[in-house]
Amino acid sequence: METLSSKYINVNGSLLDLSVPCVMGILNITPDSFYAGSRMQTEAEITARAQQILDEGAGIIDIGAYSSRPNAENVSPHEEMERLRMGLEILRKTHPGAVISVDTFRADVARMCVEEYGVAIINDIAAGEMDTDMFRTCLLYTSPSPRDTERS
């Protein structure tokens, strides 16, 4: 028996329907992304790429500020946060209703994105293996389901 929760996820208080495929469009704000054509640096480039993602039918914009390509430059947590702040400020201004995911493997970066910009999805390519605080951070910002609240 399927339950309602198996087809939806809570994204900042709204349900995102996953009973049908949901495409996630990638927005790289790194100067050294694997694919040169995906490197967005200016407000105009970021805005245009976000609009393209949505126009092509994606339900989620996944923004990343740390390249995962082989031999990519190591970026400090501070630099990753500054890049994301710039990108997220642009997205919140130009596409306020868009569902935003942040691609990071760092718990501190994820925390900043949730606290300062209300990001509801964290996309960690390392699945918590590169930062032992990632699971704790995600759990801290996960709303309990009504069923879990009843058990407390």
Question: What role is predicted for each listed range?
Answer:
Residues 1-28:
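N-terminal amphipathic alpha-helix/helix-capping segment at the start of soluble metabolic enzymes
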Residues 27, 57, 122:
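Conserved, mostly hydrophobic/aromatic
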Residues 31-45:
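Active-site mouth loops of central-metabolism enzymes
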Residues 34-35, 61-83:
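Glycine-rich, proline-tolerant flexible connector loops at the mouths of alpha/beta enzymes
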Residues 75-83, 108, 128-139:
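Active-site-adjacent beta->alpha loops and helix N-cap segments on the catalytic face
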Residues 76-100:
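Alpha-helix-loop-beta-strand connector modules within alpha/beta enzyme cores
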Residues 99-105, 120-129:
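Catalytic beta/alpha-barrel core
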Residues 141-148:
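Conserved small/polar residues in nucleotide/adenosyl-binding loops
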